[in-house]
Amino acid sequence: MSRKSNETAFALKMQTTPNVFDAPNTTTDMLAISNLQFSIAGVTVTNNEYTGSIHKNGDDLAGKTVSGSFNVYLRPPGGADVPAADAFLIGRILKAAKFAEVRTSTAIPPAAAALGVGSDPTHAVLGTAAATVDDTYKGMAIVLSDIATTAYDRVTAVRHYVGTSKSAELMEVLGAPPAANYQIPKQLSYQRDMTQADAPSLSTKLWLGGLRYDLVDCQVSGLRWNVPVSTRDAASQPMLEVSFTATIANYDDEASPTVPALGAVPLFKDGKFWVAGKAVGGSSVVIDFGLRVAYPPNPNYTEGSEPGELVESRTTINMDRKAYLKAQFDTLAMAQGQAQYGVFAQWGYASGRMVQIVVPDARFNYQSPNVGQDFITEQGDMWVDVFNRNVCLNFVYYA
């Protein structure tokens, strides 16, 4: 019988000790992936010895590199409450890419409270119980009870927070100042970790048509969030595009376990997309974290190198965005000025199924017009500098 591509399965677990495989559970640690590419490549050294003829001997085999890539749909955890620590499988990938998992398991305050005095369309002044430390709520979801009639439209996000005045700058511009209640809802957040601590590694199992690979010291070497807009003409799921490197700890013949069906993925539509204080149209937004992994040389290891470590990340945002008139949205002036602007995407209709991407500050590169289709669009990058919580991903549980 032939091995079949569809009989592919993947499981992952946070690894506690370098070079020691932690076996993932074949029930609770199974992650649905797609578009897998997997490579085992030889590391060779040319043999330059003379042979007394025009012919040369083959290369010496020095070792191997193991790498791959896959996509995983950006499916929220769902359920009625925030998952337990480290239970959300996509979160393990994010932690290995230098994100911190932050669980807000109780809303703040537990019951919605009255706003303070002085709110305007871009700021919500929180009530007396709100935190007094700057940026406590930066990058997090917030519910403002009077900004919309539907529950999911009452959810927005905090760009910056000033503790002394309890003023939360918002990621969108409201039609009128909020004047009723506020609450920081329960949420599972992944906030970019700016500490010097090394990103953790993963232990993974990969089944390819009845053959299992145990991969140790699995390091996320590339990460992109690809969020296409679903329209009346075409639809596509938001996803994480993941690259990895690893070492083979073991391999054996083993039937691929079943990967559970997890239901539909929320699509990016009927939501919010704000850039620089304007609700904009477009067909996609992609965040590339520009990860780079290196391997310290060490002859005590089988391959002559220690496990890979993240050594660099350079984050950019690329959009295919609707083009506007100068008076509406002047990207040329914004690029020339090099000020910081917020980028905010939100979608999903239900509590536990809502997704937010919050980039509080990013700078425009020059944007190029694209005239090749029915509508003129602009394409170009925005640069994300090194700030605390410079990119946040929230899964929101709201009442």
Stretch-by-stretch model annotation:
Residues M1-A399:
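Signature of extracytoplasmic/envelope-associated structural regions
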